[in-house]
């Protein structure tokens, strides 16, 4: 259902088309710095000095401050080894760093390792229906995770820390193959002004399907949580008020002590066009095997279910809802064994979304 993209990866920093992570609301002239495939970008990015620390990763060298904790180290501490294939920094016009986003590359085996840890959790709030997004001239579509969910039933509004540690977004085209134009998805923390709240940005062709898995790098007080998903379109020949894409989301909010990670970590995958509708559930897009019935940790109306029974990984349906990375405890990582499912039918690959090179 997933396959590694044969397209050449590109991160044309500042370019509207063909970028995995864009600069958001900042201007494209020297306001964004990025690293990709071991190459230091030429747009406004000085070469790393000899005295600057270098983190060596597969296919990537990331200059970091001595106090920085790279995203792959954070994942390895939780028993998950997903190499970073792209790092994108968002900078304000004055050069101050706004945020950072990592694109992680993984294979079938890595995905199973990540999934088995998350199967022990039952706090994934899922919207089981796709939402249409209409195109309006001069207007962006935006919806709030809080207002669009049963947020008030999920947690009490207080000032204790809460962390958006999983946000899954599936995008499907509502137009035929070959339709020109692009759709851009942004995730932002609406508490912050002037583009500083942008956490994730991805732009791809409107006639292709994608799924994104996003882990925000910090906690906020429960009473202040205000994450928004923003959609806009470019070059799509569709009438105003009509819908070029479908979008479906699922997310998990984790309590406990505050979290502080160095950046927003993300996974991206292209959805192949021959997917049956039974395979397009948010969870099924992450882990799919043949001849399995889809179940969910959440109810049909998106309400949270806390009574989901524990099962060993070998016993559970691969189409059950799966969150992406266990940030609460590493103990569960070693509790299950995936040997019996490694040879299952079907193939699952997560890879950076395909995109054109301009």
From Swiss-Prot:
Designated name of the protein: Putative movement protein
Domain of life, per lineage: Viruses
Transport among keywords: yes
Biological process according to GO: transport of virus in host, cell to cell
Keyword annotations: Transport, Viral movement protein
Function per UniProt: Transports viral genome to neighboring plant cells directly through plasmosdesmata, without any budding. The movement protein allows efficient cell to cell propagation, by bypassing the host cell wall barrier (Potential).
């Amino acid at each position: 259902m997933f396959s590694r993209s044969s397209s050449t990866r590109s991160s044309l920093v500042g370019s509207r088309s063909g970028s995995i992570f864009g600069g958001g609301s900042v201007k494209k002239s020297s306001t964004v710095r990025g690293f990709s495939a071991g190459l230091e970008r030429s747009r406004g990015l000085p070469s790393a000095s000899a005295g600057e620390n270098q983190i060596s990763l597969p296919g990537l060298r990331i200059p970091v401050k001595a106090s920085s904790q790279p995203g792959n180290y954070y994942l390895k501490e939780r028993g998950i080894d997903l190499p970073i294939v792209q790092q994108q920094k968002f900078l304000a016009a004055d050069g101050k760093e706004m945020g950072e986003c990592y694109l992680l590359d993984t294979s079938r085996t890595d995905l199973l390792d990540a999934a088995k840890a998350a199967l022990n959790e039952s706090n994934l709030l899922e919207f089981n229906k796709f939402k249409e997004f209409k195109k309006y001239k001069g207007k962006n579509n935006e919806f709030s995770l809080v207002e669009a969910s049963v947020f008030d039933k999920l947690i009490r509004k207080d000032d204790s820390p809460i962390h958006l540690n999983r946000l899954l977004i599936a995008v499907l085209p509502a137009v035929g193959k070959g339709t020109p134009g692009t759709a851009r998805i942004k995730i932002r923390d609406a508490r912050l002004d002037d583009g500083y709240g942008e956490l994730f940005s991805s732009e791809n062709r409107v006639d292709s399907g994608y799924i994104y898995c996003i882990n925000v790098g910090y906690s906020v007080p429960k009473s202040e949580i205000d994450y928004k998903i923003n959609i806009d379109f470019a070059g799509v020949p569709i009438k105003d008020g009509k819908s070029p894409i479908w979008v479906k989301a699922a997310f998990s909010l984790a309590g406990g002590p505050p979290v502080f990670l160095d950046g927003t970590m993300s996974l991206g995958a292209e959805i192949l066009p021959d997917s049956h509708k039974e395979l397009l559930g948010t969870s099924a897009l992450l882990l799919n095997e043949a001849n399995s019935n889809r179940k969910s940790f959440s109810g049909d109306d998106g309400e949270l279910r806390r009574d989901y029974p524990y099962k060993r990984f070998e016993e559970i349906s691969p189409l059950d809802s799966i969150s992406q990375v266990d940030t609460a405890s590493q103990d569960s990582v070693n509790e299950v064994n995936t040997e019996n499912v490694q040879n299952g039918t079907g193939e699952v690959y997560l890879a950076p979304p395909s995109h054109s090179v301009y």
